[in-house]
């Protein structure tokens, strides 16, 4: 399994913005700041803007932030018990393939729990 | 097996300092913290393997109250594995949980309980050398990371609504919201529906199977919104209409619930993209499917800013674009990176 163009990744507790695990590079070399930002974005999407409640029983799957230099993908890790984790992958804009990365992140998030 | 949170002989100190000391000496045992809520942090050769507190649901409560495990399954694992301290391993070996689930659950429960056990500036603390936990070692966390995270979590709560009484007092929703329209998250709704004026935040966390810290965090947000009676302003009278004074003290309309700024801006990657995690990605051997190819084509070439999809789903790609794909194999991250996330999970604790 490959995510071409991935520069760095982490698993973040989005209630607290705590990076549970990190690997590779982080924006500004600061995984903790990236994790805090990740948590803010997830909170904004779930609790403040109401995108996730547009349809009954809708569920937030992922969030994609596009900058001129990169893609920032956030994928919610679904567990049966209360865990509140999000997988974050930073993709290089030129080398990355957004659609492929998105599908592979889904697989990774599922495998994190399923194995 | 010193699982209880009963303190016999102890001195008053900062729990985090004692944890650091136990870690420095690579000790094995339990740091038992008294007071309210108190708790215990279990260390194995200087690394934290578990923590528990009456204010935080443990692994068993999280797994059973969510319905992930039947109460009987959990009880069986306890009966079988408690004496040998391998309850966690048993659940995986018997196929009730995956290793990933167990690790994520233990990790979450440990940081959660550690917050309650260690957040007091001073409390009666005692180190019980040799004490082991029946769960067994599932994760190994650096105590420094725990201490830092505890301090950060204290700060986060105060940024939301700086009143620690909310964390412990019986939860009592205001009978009438302080404004015409309010928006709640699912957890906030659950908390308000189950708050009966008697249950404390810890009771609610256990009842709902939610992390104790997440519960307290949402309650502080509710308090900031003016939706909770603060202990001080509670009265025994049954008046249903609150005086404006109450609103004023409880509602801080200008306070953003979540830090709106100060967070890191999404950075701009400069021309030379970081290649710290450069690992050979055999992308050429992995042809993107047609649905992905347009994206790839665009990215393989020089970056052209606002390029919107001009192709209908399923339509054939223009020949010149399709020819470009796949892009030159990028020494990007891959399977190794993903595996490293798992490895990092283990390495970080």
List PLM regions with ranges.
Chain A
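A generic fold-level signal
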Residues: 4, 57-58, 83
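Short N-terminal helix-loop-first-beta-strand/juxtamembrane motif that initiates sensory/input modules
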Residues: 2-15
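Generic secondary-structure signature for well-ordered alpha-helical cores
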Residues: 5, 47-50, 110, 114
């Amino acid at each position: 399994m490959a995510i071409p163009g991935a520069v760095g990744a982490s698993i973040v507790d989005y209630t607290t913005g705590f990076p549970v695990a990190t690997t590779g590079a982080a924006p500004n070399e600061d995984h903790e700041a990236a994790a805090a930002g990740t948590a803010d974005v997830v909170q904004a999407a779930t609790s403040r803007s109401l995108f996730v409640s547009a349809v009954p029983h809708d569920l937030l799957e992922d969030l994609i932030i596009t900058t001129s230099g990169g893609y920032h993908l956030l994928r919610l890790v679904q567990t049966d018990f209360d865990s509140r984790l999000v997988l974050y992958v930073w993709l290089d804009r030129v080398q990355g393939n957004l659609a492929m990365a998105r599908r592979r992140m889904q697989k990774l998030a599922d495998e994190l729990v399923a194995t | 097996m010193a699982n209880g949170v009963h303190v016999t002989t102890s001195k008053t100190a900062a729990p985090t300092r004692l944890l650091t000391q136990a870690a420095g000496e690579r000790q094995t045992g339990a740091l038992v913290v008294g007071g309210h809520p108190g708790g215990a942090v279990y260390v194995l050769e200087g690394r934290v393997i578990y923590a528990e507190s009456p204010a935080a649901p443990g692994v068993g409560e999280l797994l059973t109250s969510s319905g992930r495990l039947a109460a009987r399954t959990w009880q069986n694992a306890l009966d079988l594995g408690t004496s040998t301290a391998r309850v966690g391993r048993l659940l995986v070996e018997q196929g009730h949980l995956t290793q990933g689930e167990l690790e994520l659950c233990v990790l979450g429960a440990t940081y959660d309980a550690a917050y309650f056990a260690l957040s007091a500036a001073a409390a009666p603390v005692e180190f019980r050398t040799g004490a082991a936990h029946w769960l067994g070692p599932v994760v190994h966390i650096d105590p420094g990371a725990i201490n830092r995270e505890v301090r950060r979590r204290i700060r986060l709560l105060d940024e939301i609504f700086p009143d620690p009484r909310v964390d412990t007092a019986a939860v009592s929703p205001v009978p009438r919201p302080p404004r015409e329209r309010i928006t709640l998250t699912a957890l906030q709704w659950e908390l308000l529906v189950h708050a009966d004026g008697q249950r404390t935040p810890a009771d609610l966390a256990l009842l709902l199977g939610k992390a104790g810290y997440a519960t307290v965090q949402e309650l502080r947000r509710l308090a900031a919104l003016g939706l909770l009676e603060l202990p001080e302003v509670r009265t025994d009278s049954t008046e249903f209409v609150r005086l404006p004074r109450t609103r004023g003290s409880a509602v801080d309309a200008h306070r953003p619930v979540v830090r709106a700024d100060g967070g890191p801006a999404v950075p701009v990657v400069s021309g030379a993209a970081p290649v710290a995690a450069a690992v050979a990605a055999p992308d050429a051997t992995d042809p993107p499917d047609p649905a992905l190819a347009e994206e790839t084509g665009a990215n393989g070439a020089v970056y052209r800013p606002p390029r919107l999809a001009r192709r209908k789903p399923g339509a054939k790609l223009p020949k010149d674009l399709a020819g470009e794909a796949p892009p030159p194999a990028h020494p990007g991250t891959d399977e190794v990176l993903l595996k490293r996330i798992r490895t990092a999970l283990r390495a970080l604790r």
